[in-house]
Amino acid sequence: MNNLIIGIAGGSGSGKTTLALRLKERFGEDEVRLISHDSYYKRHDELPFEERCKLNYNHPDAFDNALLIYHLQELKAGRAIDCPVYDYSNHNRSDKVQHIEPAPVLIVEGILPFVEPELCALFDYKIYVDTDADERILRRLVRDVKERGRSLDSVIEQYLTTVKPMHEAFVEPSKRNADIIVPNGGENTAAVEMLAHHIRNLIEKANRL
């Protein structure tokens, strides 16, 4: 199948998901599929909740990239997948899956999709969202408390102990692998329009091959 795999990376709260959604709005309903890298956090049924809370979810080793790579290859070959569903409040994968059909454009967004070389190599176009650190932490606080059922104290502790140091060690350096750096994510309307136009051109080019 002549589809494109677009990667969107950036720090937690940078606006990656918003950018992915804004791009999807520029295309038809069946043209784009969104996949969150977070869905591929490793399963930890063997650990009690208290221990799962202490895990470093901002390190490359936290992700089951082998499964994501396999799923992207399946979609590329025109076959549907059952994507894992991650439960943020329980710090573990749920027993549910999300059925995803192939589409002309596959968008994968997350904090670390550009770190693993084999995964990074699958992306036809790589976008890094660069947002001020103060803005990122404020967005993360609001999101994790309101949308993910987290306590304020747990979000702050996680930010200081793992999110910030892992951003500096892995996320920020990974932007060197990007094809383009976009300030402020989905709030950058001009960038959204430019990217949508460029992706449309890439689709047309792929269909001519």
PLM region spans:
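P-loop (Walker A) phosphate-binding loop of NTP-binding proteins
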Residues: 11
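Conserved nucleotide-sensing/catalytic segment adjacent to the nucleotide-binding pocket
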Residues: 33, 42, 46-88
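Conserved lysine of the Walker
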Residues: 16
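NTP-dependent small-molecule kinase module
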Residues: 101-102, 142, 164-209
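ATP-dependent NMP and nucleoside kinases share a basic, alpha-helical "lid"
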Residues: 94-148
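Hydrophobic positions on the alpha1 helix immediately C-terminal to the Walker A/P-loop
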Residues: 19
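Phosphate-binding/switch loop-helix module in NTP-utilizing enzymes
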Residues: 71-108, 113-114, 206
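Post-Walker A helix-loop "phosphate-sensing" segment adjacent to the P-loop in P-loop NTPases
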Residues: 25-33
